[in-house]
A protein has these predicted regions:
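Hydrophobic alpha-helical signal peptides and transmembrane signal-/tail-anchor segments
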Residues: 1-13, 17-25
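N-terminal helix-turn-helix DNA-binding module of bacterial transcription factors
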Residues: 16-103
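Amphipathic helical "hinge" segments at domain boundaries
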Residues: 30-31, 47, 89-158
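Periplasmic-binding protein-like
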Residues: 106-107, 167-172, 230-232, 264, ...
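Hinge/beta->alpha junction and helix N-cap segments in small-molecule ligand-binding domains
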Residues: 113, 121-127, 145-156, 206-216, ...
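Short, well-structured alpha-helical segments in soluble
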Residues: 154-165, 274-286
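Flexible loop/hinge segments that line or gate small-molecule binding clefts
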Residues: 172-213, 297, 323-335
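Flexible loop/turn connectors
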Residues: 279-384
Length: 384
């Protein structure tokens, strides 16, 4: 193959001269815009792929962006084979400029004042990490990226919306209804939340049946012969925990068990809060034989606190958690828990958010409440 080179002089203003050496291979595959089989220097364009495949640039664009309803399978395979062979990667910046989308979703974790004072790191919370992982998985499937930020002031969310170049945001632990209404009025992009108390026609909000969740766990204890059942969580701190507390009381009432406020331990539904409750149950020689709570991490703390007080789990104290996180399988004994199907919550919220970003609306309701169920393991003993 013959080859040669040219020295190209480019004269710029102010008598500035820059010299570019361009190696020109007489084989045109080395021209700028091609890869010549070397992906590390690939600068291939849609036109290059179209020329190699013998199709239009629009067809190549449709294949890359998944708009293939009018593209034959043979053409798709041919275009994809060229993309793979030459290591072509779409330029996201160029795509963003052309369709005015950043392909970035902001994930905001809203901290309350108690969390800030306690120095809570929500990224260490298994529920949060599981939820973010499930969201990121769905976004990745749709070629979206994430920006994650925790905020301690509600006003920070509005500030982030103004300064972040995001196509939409997902809020974990959303603020009270009044502030969320204000946020929705000032929002410049679609918003999705989980377990928000605000009902707004434009807000995507995915919840689970919280009241039913604690109803099921309490009834499960009752069906195994327990009547002195503790509830562990500061239920006054959020509407979600309040709903779960109502489920606990409903199960007692339906089974003619008198509610005893002494069996309510108003600790944070965290590992540390669980340890405090477990220690207290064990040290007071309480008649309590079972404990239900609103988070798996708290349930694990209850088991550890009770053990430190000399109790055996589940012989002396049966425990049921909430969330059915993977770590339930690694405790000793394995933790029985209420499943609210976190992956499904994440998938539904993400799909509705992306649909709204793409079309401006959603084909179904923005509000959805998923069902819950008990996942039986080893942390409950029958007294019968």
């Amino acid at each position: 193959m013959n080859s040669g080179f040219f020295i190209v002089f480019l004269f710029l203003p102010e008598k500035c001269v820059r010299i570019f050496y361009i190696i020109y291979m007489y084989d045109s595959s080395f021209l700028p815009g091609n890869c010549y089989g070397r992906t590390e220097v690939c600068s291939m364009t849609l036109k290059d792929i179209a020329d190699l495949a013998g199709v239009s640039m629009m067809t190549v664009s449709n294949v890359i962006n998944g708009k293939t309803s009018r593209v034959s399978q043979k053409t798709r395979d041919k275009v994809n084979a060229i993309i793979e062979e030459y290591g072509y990667v779409p330029n996201l910046n160029a795509r963003s400029l052309s369709n005015k989308k950043s392909h970035i979703i902001g994930i905001i974790i809203s901290l309350d004042e108690k969390d800030v004072l306690r120095g809570t790191n929500y990224f260490e919370n298994p529920y949060v990490s599981t939820m973010i992982g499930a969201i990121e998985k769905e976004l990745q499937k749709n070629e979206y990226f994430t920006m994650i930020r925790s905020v301690s002031k509600n006003a920070d969310i509005i500030s982030l919306l103004k300064n972040w170049n995001v196509d939409g945001i997902i809020i974990l632990y959303p603020a009270a209804g009044e502030y969320m209404a204000k946020l929705m009025d000032s929002a410049t992009c679609p918003i999705a939340t989980f377990d928000c108390e605000l009902e707004h026609s434009n807000l995507i909000n995915i919840t689970s049946n919280d009241e039913k969740g604690l109803y099921l766990s309490t009834k499960y204890m009752i069906n195994h012969g327990h009547s002195a059942i503790a509830f562990v969580a500061d239920y006054k701190s959020s509407h979600v925990l309040a709903n779960r507390f109502n489920g606990y009381k409903r199960a007692l009432e339906e089974n003619h068990i008198t509610f005893n406020p002494d069996y309510v331990y108003e600790y944070s539904p965290s590992y540390e809060g669980g340890i405090q409750a477990g220690r207290e149950i064990a040290s007071n020689s309480s008649p309590v034989t079972a404990a239900v709570t609103t988070a798996d991490i708290c349930a694990i703390g209850i088991m550890e606190g009770a053990r430190l007080g000399g109790y055996r789990i589940p012989v002396d104290l049966s425990v049921i958690g909430y969330d059915n996180l993977t770590l339930c399988q690694y405790t000793l004994p394995k933790l029985t828990s209420v499943s609210q199907n976190i992956p499904q919550k994440a998938k539904l919220a993400t799909s509705l958010l992306l649909e709204k970003i793409r079309t401006g609306s959603v084909s179904s309701s923005c509000q959805a409440a998923l069902d819950v169920e008990i996942v039986d393991r080893q942390s409950v003993i029958s007294l019968y």
